[in-house]
From Swiss-Prot:
It holds the Pfam family Proton_antipo_M. One of its GO terms (molecular function) is NADH dehydrogenase (ubiquinone) activity. The gene is nuoN. This is NADH-quinone oxidoreductase subunit N. The keyword NAD applies. InterPro entries: NADH-Q_OxRdtase_suN/2, ND/Mrp_TM. Its main location: membrane. The chain crosses the membrane at residues 6-26, 40-60, 69-89, 106-125, 129-151, 164-184, 207-227, 239-259, 276-296, 302-322, 337-357, 380-400, 417-437, 464-484.
Length: 500
């Protein structure tokens, strides 16, 4: 018999599931091409689950359900809350774009987005290999369908096919690695796997063999080198509203899954996976920044930017354990979580501008499409400038403190190799600043092209959300301590559960 606590653990997921099905049914009777009722119900659902998750997080308790297959803890609850808010913002930005391209027909855009979020929730709360994998597959299958939503668009169809083939390969890697760990430890439960490895009664070679495949699968979901090949093509080929769905909230779910597997499950193997993360971080910083410099397509540039940002995120993850010492675990993983949250917030603002500048029959995807944006809309230009400055890591924007937190975690480790990595990361950030500042130069100093001279029109709700989104980049940069503390305390709950 399933106890009451188990049902409490999955209340938000049940609400999300029921509402996604209900919205699909309601949409059958909606005739409006802009799907106003479906849109309102989607926002209501996302707001409700965000409030539920925030209440769980503020409770500060950690408890398990369904035979330890699901965990509710502050880290997971906050990440699910922020994922819901991120998707809510995405839906607000994406609705005008999707309506102009007949993507709201049938209501699949909203329904698939909610089911993708359900998969993210399962990824974040899963404490069992099979549960994590099921959540991952639910999210990715919905993502494949969303990328291919414009069936008459050859570029989107090509992107969906690439995403599907490479995604299936990465899922196979991850599943094979998990099966190796199951064979070695005899358990699918993350806590039991941790205890089995810590007991040193399992062959190290078998564990490392499985670990390689797991890290490969996780790197694909994060978009880290050398498993980044899908990212630029999918970002560029997918409809921009879908690009933001893929590049926003799923990054938080991928971060949570990485913490669940590598920290909660495989922390005794830290010295092994840290070496892999270090190589991937270096590759991501180099390839991401150098490739972004050569791009003229804004979405493709932001895709390579994402790869470089994931390099910074990986640096935070590898700084948590130093020679088996977990003294800096909380600060390092807290800095990584803070980095993930601020990256998603900044990405939402940047892609929000691209979405709101697009109009029927025209995609504002080229950097030159932003020419003279300040003359047409100082608000849009200001938000985009803050996004670029934040991604570049310049004060007083929140991206500066995100990068600073990761660098402090590396330096405080006291390891020469980590200090070298910190210096290298700063150097690559200087290269990255070039292509971010190029966007600002185009907006403020170039004359608008003739096809960009039309006045910008966007729904009031989207403009309000955009203004708040941009303001948060500045406010959290001026006063980042509250969010930093929240991240550190969330990670502390994970560390305490491990007894390290």
């Amino acid at each position: 018999m399933i106890d009451k606590l188990s049902w409490i653990a999955v209340y938000p997921e049940l609400v999300l599931l029921v509402m996604a099905c209900l919205i699909a049914l309601v949409d059958l009777g909606v005739k409006s091409p802009r799907r106003t009722l479906t849109y309102a119900l989607t926002l209501l659902t996302l707001g409700a689950v965000a409030v539920m998750e925030a209440s769980y997080a503020l409770g500060g308790q950690t408890f398990y359900g369904f035979g330890n297959m699901v965990v509710v803890d502050p880290m997971g609850s906050w990440l699910k809350c922020f994922s819901s808010i991120a998707l809510m913002i995405t839906v607000v930005y994406g609705r005008p774009y999707a309506a102009d391209r007949d993507m709201l027909r049938g209501g699949e855009f909203f329904t698939l987005s909610l089911f993708a979020l359900l998969g993210m929730f399962v990824m974040i709360s899963g404490h069992n290999f099979l549960v994590l994998y099921m959540g991952l597959e639910l999210m990715t299958l919905c993502s494949y369908a969303l990328v291919a939503l414009r069936r008459d668009d050859a570029q989107a169809t090509e992107a969906a096919m690439k995403y599907f083939v490479l995604g299936a390969l990465a899922s196979g890697f991850l599943l094979y690695g998990l099966s190796m760990l199951y064979g070695a430890t005899g358990s699918l439960n993350i806590n039991e796997v941790f205890n089995a490895i810590a007991s040193r009664q399992v062959k190290h070679q078998v564990l490392v063999f499985g670990l390689v495949f797991i890290v490969a699968g996780l790197a694909f979901k994060l978009g880290a080198v050398p498993f980044h090949m899908w990212l630029p093509d999918v970002y560029q080929g997918a409809p921009t509203a879908v690009t933001l769905i893929i590049g926003g909230a799923p990054q938080l779910a991928a971060f949570a899954m990485t913490i669940r597997l590598l920290v909660e499950g495989l922390l005794p193997l830290a010295i092994d996976w840290q070496q892999m993360l270090a190589l991937m971080a270096i590759g991501s910083l180099v390839i991401g920044n150098l490739a972004a410099v050569a791009q003229t397509n804004l979405k493709r540039m932001l895709a390579f930017s994402t790869i470089s940002q994931m390099g910074f995120l990986l640096l935070g993850l590898l700084a948590g354990v130093v020679n088996g010492n977990q003294l800096h675990t909380e600060s390092a993983y807290g800095a990584a979580m803070f980095y993930a949250l601020t990256y998603v917030l900044t990405t939402l603002a940047a892609f929000g501008i691209i979405l709101l500048l697009a109009r029927a029959g025209h995609e504002s995807e080229e950097i030159t499409d932003l020419s003279g944006l300040n003359q047409r809309s100082p608000l849009y230009a200001g938000v985009m400038a803050m996004s670029m400055f934040s991604l570049a890591g310049l004060p007083p924007l929140v991206g500066f403190y995100a990068k600073l937190g990761v660098l402090q975690a590396l330096i405080s480790s006291g390891q020469t190799s980590y200090l070298v990595l910190a210096v290298f990361a700063v150097f690559m950030s200087l290269i990255g600043a070039f292509y971010y500042l190029r966007v600002i130069k185009v907006m403020y100093f170039d004359a608008p092209h003739s096809h960009n001279a039309q006045p910008i029109s966007a729904p009031a709700d989207a403009q309000i959300v955009l203004a708040i989104n941009g303001a948060l980049l500045l406010v959290l940069g001026i006063a980042p301590s509250s969010l930093m503390t929240l991240c550190a305390q969330s990670i502390n709950s994970i560390v305490n559960s491990l007894g390290v």
